[in-house]
Amino acid sequence: MLGVLRIQGALASAGQARLLSVRLLASKSTTDMTTNRGESTQSTSTEHFDIIIGGGGLVGTTLAAALAKNSTLADKKVLLLEGAPEFRGFNPTGPYQNRVSAINHNSIELFKSIDAWKHIESARYKPVKQMQVWESNTDALIQFQHDNFASDVACIIENDLILDAVYALAKESPNVEILNKARIQCVRLPRDSNSNHSELQLEDGRNFSCDLLIGADGANSVVRKEMNVDVFSLNYDRMGLVATLELGEDACDNSVAWQRFLPNGPVALLPLTDRLSSLVWSTTNEQAKMLQALPPTEFVDALNEAFCRQYPRVELADKAVQALNSLFGHNGSQHQVQYPPRVCGVLDKSRATFPLGFLHASSYVCNGAALVGDAAHRVHPLAGQGVNLGFSDVRYLVESLAAGAYAGFKLGDKQHLIKYERKCLAKNVPIMLGVHGLHTLYATQFSPVVLLRSLGLQLTQNLPPVKNLFMRGAMGQ
């Protein structure tokens, strides 16, 4: 959930943060690759491109569109390798989909710069005007109001609508070629800046070479493995459950994002329309499977209970929160939890689950290659930052490539690509550590930890300048 990521990241122990920072560089990830293209059943001829993007999806396709729209890079020949079949488009009058993203200000500005935002804006999206995050073991909460910022807290947009906008831009560009059902089998990268091009072979035997290979191929990136960079990853042993929900008649102005930290993980409700919301519920693997299998009426009852149920209280933490509010001269009514509109239904076949984890590559670049999106980093969805970090990668990489091309650098020159990496690491690592710290803080019911996180949340609520600072960071401003 936006806004929470930095609120308590500082509350995680300094020792843990230092340990994570070191371990980001600690776990070696290597792989043996077969580079003998003579074994292919297809022709061994090799087609050359200036840039090849290995992997499509939201980030890879947005990158292709951004490269095509950049005037300095407009003459570069780009190949987008998409593992999925050809995208069939998005129907703005069809049912709402369960895969949505909370898009922040910076990502929206990126879409505007490549002329994708007008396509999204003319279809459908929902601005988030307010947000509330609250505890289940105490009365600690934090609330954000749209009035405190120059722009909306976020915009909730279906993933396929974003893909529809950027895919159309990439497809209509004369210098971008899109190849569907294209999966990379093996990669060979240049050893140094004076070596030959990057080369790859697809599973169907086709061969390509390029000046710069960009890995946008997800958490199991083939490109990253061939780069032989250190990778730190964690399996949270948790699942995320998504669904599209119908709201009761009391949802007259559904523009608030809600998130409650439950004992097994956070549950979030994101507005889609006045009568529809999107669910992201992080919980144990067992509970996620159980929730997915429940009949619709029982699932709705379980969800409403999750938002309203009184969980066992931590008395010491509760008293500390009350004392903190009194110290700032606030009574209970001024900091009282508001509850989301009641859910009355779940759209058919909208429930789905996905595994949760953490991943970070120690380096995003090498000679002839660079990483973006989930190929470089993966975070818990509780802060809504995952895809926004990927879009930030796109912006930094295109800016760096354009500056390098203007200065006469080769596209795959690591000495210039390293500037992209430094910008990304400076932005991504603090956010990722903050998100991981939040996950760790809320994964335990140990009373001293509950006290610590509750005080941190309530202290931020009582200090508007600090609260606004955190929120602007989460919004990308």
Curated annotation (Swiss-Prot):
Pfam families tied to this protein: FAD_binding_3
Catalytic activity: a 4-hydroxy-3-(all-trans-polyprenyl)benzoate + 2 reduced [2Fe-2S]-[ferredoxin] + O2 + 2 H(+) = a 3,4-dihydroxy-5-(all-trans-polyprenyl)benzoate + 2 oxidized [2Fe-2S]-[ferredoxin] + H2O; a 2-methoxy-6-(all-trans-polyprenyl)phenol + 2 reduced [2Fe-2S]-[ferredoxin] + O2 + 2 H(+) = a 2-methoxy-6-(all-trans-polyprenyl)benzene-1,4-diol + 2 oxidized [2Fe-2S]-[ferredoxin] + H2O
Entry-linked PROSITE patterns: UBIH
Gene Ontology CC entries for this record: extrinsic component of mitochondrial inner membrane; mitochondrial inner membrane; mitochondrion; ubiquinone biosynthesis complex
Compartment annotation: Mitochondrion inner membrane
Segment annotated as transit peptide: 1-25
EC number: 1.14.15.45, 1.14.15.46
UniProt key word Transit peptide: yes
InterPro entries, per database record: FAD-bd, FAD/NAD-bd_sf, Ubi_Hdrlase_CS, UbiH/COQ6, UbiH/COQ6_monooxygenase, UbQ_mOase_COQ6
Record's keyword terms, sorted: FAD, Flavoprotein, Membrane, Mitochondrion, Mitochondrion inner membrane, Monooxygenase, Oxidoreductase, Transit peptide, Ubiquinone biosynthesis
Cross-referenced Gene3D superfamilies: FAD/NAD(P)-binding domain
Major localisation: mitochondrion
Origin superkingdom: Eukaryota
Keyword Flavoprotein in annotation: yes
GO BP: ubiquinone biosynthetic process
NCBIfam families: COQ6, Ubi-OHases
Family assignment from sequence similarity: Belongs to the UbiH/COQ6 family.
Function summary: FAD-dependent monooxygenase required for two non-consecutive steps during ubiquinone biosynthesis. Required for the C5-ring hydroxylation during ubiquinone biosynthesis by catalyzing the hydroxylation of 4-hydroxy-3-(all-trans-polyprenyl)benzoic acid to 3,4-dihydroxy-5-(all-trans-polyprenyl)benzoic acid. Also acts downstream of coq4, for the C1-hydroxylation during ubiquinone biosynthesis by catalyzing the hydroxylation of 2-methoxy-6-(all-trans-polyprenyl)phenol to 2-methoxy-6-(all-trans-polyprenyl)benzene-1,4-diol.
Subunit structure and binding partners: Component of a multi-subunit COQ enzyme complex.
Identification of the protein by name: Ubiquinone biosynthesis monooxygenase COQ6, mitochondrial
The gene coding this protein: Coq6
